[in-house]
């Protein structure tokens, strides 16, 4: 077997392999002997068919199978010999085969990038310093009350926390546009559901009024034909409602799993949940900064095969969220996911190198702690823990999470870390990277 390796483009490789005619014939003869032991041909006993008859009957198909097998086995031998690490499925490019002659073919594939980690001491991390205080707990309880509120019709103007039922028709330069019309649309004020200026135009008006709002669509609006455009909305205000908050009775409090129905019990439960959420938010914020710094300091080539695979994963996840099937998932435009997929591949490759260089292995105590932390959000934590312990796939996922945490901590130990005081709301409402 003769082997040569070419670099095609970037991480692309082409391995050229030549298999000698002698090795092909030996492999064909060996396989024909195996076939002869099992062959059933009229006029001959099983295993007693002459080799020339076996060759006539099965020679062509056996030779085809042997060539396919030799191509695969010799490719594996070649990449081991050349110390190549392929990504994805290789593409076989067979040459012309002539009986009695050497057979040449090529295999095209991508390899993993060679990564030499650098700039780890240039990673900058601001570690949030924050606690859950009494005011945070009170604000969260008020939010829970608002979520459970009822609505009643009110006289007078639309206020900042009211709800309005409207008809609207949008137009640009006097022409209506797709998606710009609705009837009996219920709009809760202060939630930022509409484009800037729309809610402000509703405030202060009364039921029965008809008026026009002038707004401008943001430059980053999702519809290309509306980006940055000035528009008018004709509004019919049909109904104004105000929120009626539930009383803090024992019955109301028990809805949140507080058995004794006491306000102190509710505050304790809310604080516990907020503390758990805060811990996750702090961890995620630190992790995001570490990974941003790692990616910024280490520019690497990315195998297209890995990006393609990650795009398919993201497509399926998106389809699942909206109740779509496999076919619908694959029809989603790859452009929607390409940037995120590439980022995930880069992070995965760099973290893999950190794990390898640091010789990290998933710590069992950390794995168990992660499972217990996750289970604490459920009504019966022990049941969840036992479920995970019996599920191999879930346990592998948790080990990977633990290993990723350990890699982030290894990077954090080399980073430039400072502390920054913040509040619960600031941290929880901060956009995630």
UniProtKB/Swiss-Prot annotation:
PANTHER family per the UniProt record, alphabetical: TRIGGER FACTOR CHAPERONE AND PEPTIDYL-PROLYL CIS/TRANS ISOMERASE (PTHR30560), TRIGGER FACTOR-LIKE PROTEIN TIG, CHLOROPLASTIC (PTHR30560:SF3)
Keyword presence, Endoplasmic reticulum: no
Membrane-spanning ranges: none
InterPro entries: PPIase_dom_sf, PPIase_FKBP_dom, Trig_fac, Trigger_fac_C, Trigger_fac_C_sf, Trigger_fac_ribosome-bd_bac, Trigger_fac_ribosome-bd_sf, Trigger_fact/SurA_dom_sf
Family: Belongs to the FKBP-type PPIase family. Tig subfamily.
GO cellular component terms listed in the entry, alphabetical order: cytoplasm
Protein's recorded name: Trigger factor
Keywords: Cell cycle, Cell division, Chaperone, Cytoplasm, Isomerase, Rotamase
Subcellular location: Cytoplasm
Annotated ranges, domain PPIase FKBP-type: 161-246
Keyword Lipoprotein: no
Pfam families: FKBP_C, Trigger_C, Trigger_N
Molecular function as annotated in GO: peptidyl-prolyl cis-trans isomerase activity; protein folding chaperone; ribosome binding
Gene that produces this protein: tig
Chain's role: Involved in protein export. Acts as a chaperone by maintaining the newly synthesized protein in an open conformation. Functions as a peptidyl-prolyl cis-trans isomerase.
One GO term (biological process): protein unfolding
Assigned EC number: 5.2.1.8
Domain text: Consists of 3 domains; the N-terminus binds the ribosome, the middle domain has PPIase activity, while the C-terminus has intrinsic chaperone activity on its own.
Catalytic reactions on record: [protein]-peptidylproline (omega=180) = [protein]-peptidylproline (omega=0)
Organism: Edwardsiella ictaluri (strain 93-146)
Enzyme class name: isomerase
């Amino acid at each position: 077997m003769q082997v040569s390796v070419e670099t095609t483009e970037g991480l692309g490789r082409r391995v050229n392999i030549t298999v000698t005619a002698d090795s092909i014939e030996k492999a064909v003869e060996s396989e024909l002997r195996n076939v002869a032991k099992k062959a059933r041909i009229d006029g001959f006993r099983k295993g007693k068919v002459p080799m020339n008859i076996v060759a006539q009957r099965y020679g062509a198909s056996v030779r085809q199978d042997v060539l396919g097998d030799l191509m695969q086995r010799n490719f594996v031998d070649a990449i081991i010999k050349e110390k190549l690490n392929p990504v994805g499925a290789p593409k076989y490019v067979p040459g012309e085969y002539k009986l009695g002659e050497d057979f040449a073919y090529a295999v095209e594939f991508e390899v993993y990038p060679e990564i030499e980690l650098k700039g780890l001491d240039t990673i900058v991390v601001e570690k949030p310093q924050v606690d859950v205080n009494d005011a945070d707990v009170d604000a969260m309880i008020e939010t829970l009350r608002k979520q459970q509120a009822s609505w009643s019709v009110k006289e007078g103007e639309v206020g900042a926390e009211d709800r309005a039922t409207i008809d609207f028709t949008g137009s640009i330069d006097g022409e209506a546009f797709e998606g710009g019309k609705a009837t009996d649309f219920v709009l809760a004020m202060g939630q930022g559901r509409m484009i800037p200026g729309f809610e402000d135009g509703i405030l202060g008006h009364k039921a029965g009024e008809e008026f026009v709002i002038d707004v401008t669509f943001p430059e980053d609006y999702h519809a290309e034909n509306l980006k940055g455009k000035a528009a008018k909305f004709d509004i019919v205000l049909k109904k104004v409602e105000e929120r009626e908050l539930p009383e803090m009775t024992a019955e109301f409090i028990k809805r949140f799993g507080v058995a004794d129905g006491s306000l102190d019990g509710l505050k304790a439960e809310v604080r516990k949940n907020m503390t758990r959420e805060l811990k996750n938010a702090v961890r995620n914020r630190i992790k995001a900064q570490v990974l941003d710094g790692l990616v910024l300091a280490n520019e690497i080539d990315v195998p297209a095969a890995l990006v393609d695979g990650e795009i398919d994963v993201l497509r399926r996840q998106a389809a699942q969220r909206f109740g779509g099937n496999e076919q619908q998932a694959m029809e989603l435009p790859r452009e929607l996911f390409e940037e995120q997929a590439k980022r995930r591949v880069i992070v995965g490759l760099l973290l893999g190198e950190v794990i390898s260089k640091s010789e990290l292995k998933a710590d069992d105590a950390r794995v168990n702690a992660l499972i217990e932390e996750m289970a604490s959000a459920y009504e019966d934590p022990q049941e969840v823990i036992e479920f995970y312990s019996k599920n191999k796939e879930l346990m592998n996922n948790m080990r990977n999470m633990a290993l990723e945490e350990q890699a982030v901590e290894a990077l954090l130990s080399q980073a430039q870390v400072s502390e920054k005081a913040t509040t619960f709301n600031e941290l929880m409402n901060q956009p995630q990277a």
